[in-house]
């Protein structure tokens, strides 16, 4: 018998999970989004499911934390909760309020179900209203970038899982079936886990953009700037993965060439001030975390950069 799943909030993460599960033979029952057009598009991408939208309802609403606006809930809850597993893949700002509204409306239809969300920062508490009606709740977050138009492969991706025992077992099973690697995480550590991802990967968007802009100031076209930096960045990632950050560390600071740092600082005095500040902050961070002699390297780096 095929396993069944409903998906609430079919953005990039929801569509990816839905498509991958559909490919594995899961029955996709309901796909719920803010609008009919978005839900139909999500069903088209996933390849299965009944499109549903959040609409007007008699007295049941949830509040979006980011905007403070109220939205109404009206849909076929029998269809949604006919599934064994219900995924909430919505944005963090709306998840607790939306889950509460769903749980109140679904009532005992939640009993025996497994309700999971994919937030990197929120934990099972966001789904606590379902637990009060007898559902097992938890979270499973894939450490993967979902930007762009290409649906990411989840093979070998780490899934951080936490929650009630039955929810964790299901999350681990789903992660493994997707080719991923489930890793248990303590509820209290989820925010730190997400901060690690943003520090290691999310900040790259800004640092690489800064590098591209500096090359444009040096006379490169945008295309040529990308051709110059991207192979370098890819090679650095390969080296870090292979031998670790400390062994892979390269550049003037790793060689103790403080005169080069001083020249960089002078060159960066014109242009975007935030780039110079970021350069100095990242150099000091490298001196603290990667160098073999942090105290001395930090001191000389600060002198070279005049910070």
Q: What do these predicted regions represent?
A:
Residues 1-77, 81:
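NAD(P)+-binding Rossmann beta1-loop-alpha1 motif at the extreme N-terminus of oxidoreductases
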Residues 36, 69-150:
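Rossmann-like NAD(P)(H) cofactor-binding subdomain of soluble oxidoreductases
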Residues 40-45, 49, 130, 134-135, ...:
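Internal alpha-helical scaffold of NAD(P)-dependent oxidoreductase catalytic cores
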Residues 2, 227-307:
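NAD(P)-dependent Rossmann-like dehydrogenase/reductase catalytic/cofactor-binding core
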């Amino acid at each position: 018998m095929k396993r069944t799943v409903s998906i609430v909030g079919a953005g990039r993460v929801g569509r990816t999970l839905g498509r991958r599960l559909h490919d594995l033979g899961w029955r996709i029952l309901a796909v719920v989004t803010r609008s009919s057009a978005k839900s139909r598009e999500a069903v088209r991408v996933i390849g299965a499911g009944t499109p549903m939208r959040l609409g007007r309802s008699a007295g049941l609403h949830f509040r979006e934390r980011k905007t403070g606006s109220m939205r109404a809930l009206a849909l076929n809850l029998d269809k949604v909760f006919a599934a064994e597993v219900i995924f909430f893949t919505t944005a963090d700002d709306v998840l607790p309020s939306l889950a509460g509204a769903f749980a109140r409306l679904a009532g005992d239809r939640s009993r025996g179900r497994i309700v999971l969300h994919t937030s990197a920062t929120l934990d099972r508490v966001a789904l606590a209203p379902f637990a009060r009606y007898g559902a097992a709740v938890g979270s499973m977050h894939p450490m993967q970038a979902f930007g762009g138009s290409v649906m990411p492969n989840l093979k070998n991706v780490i899934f951080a899982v936490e929650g009630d025992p039955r929810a964790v077992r299901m999350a681990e099973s789903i992660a493994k079936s997707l080719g991923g690697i489930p890793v248990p995480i303590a509820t209290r550590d989820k925010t730190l886990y997400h901060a690690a991802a943003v520090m290691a990967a999310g900040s790259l968007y800004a640092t690489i953009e800064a590098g591209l802009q500096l090359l444009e100031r040096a006379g490169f076209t945008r295309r040529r700037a990308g051709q110059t930096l991207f192979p370098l960045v890819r090679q650095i990632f390969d080296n870090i993965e292979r031998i670790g950050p400390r062994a892979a560390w390269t550049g003037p600071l790793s060689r103790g060439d403080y005169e080069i740092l001083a020249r960089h600082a002078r060159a960066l005095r014109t242009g975007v001030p935030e780039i110079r500040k970021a350069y100095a902050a990242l150099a000091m961070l490298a001196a603290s975390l990667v160098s073999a002699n942090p105290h001395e390297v930090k001191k000389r780096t600060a002198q070279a950069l005049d910070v």
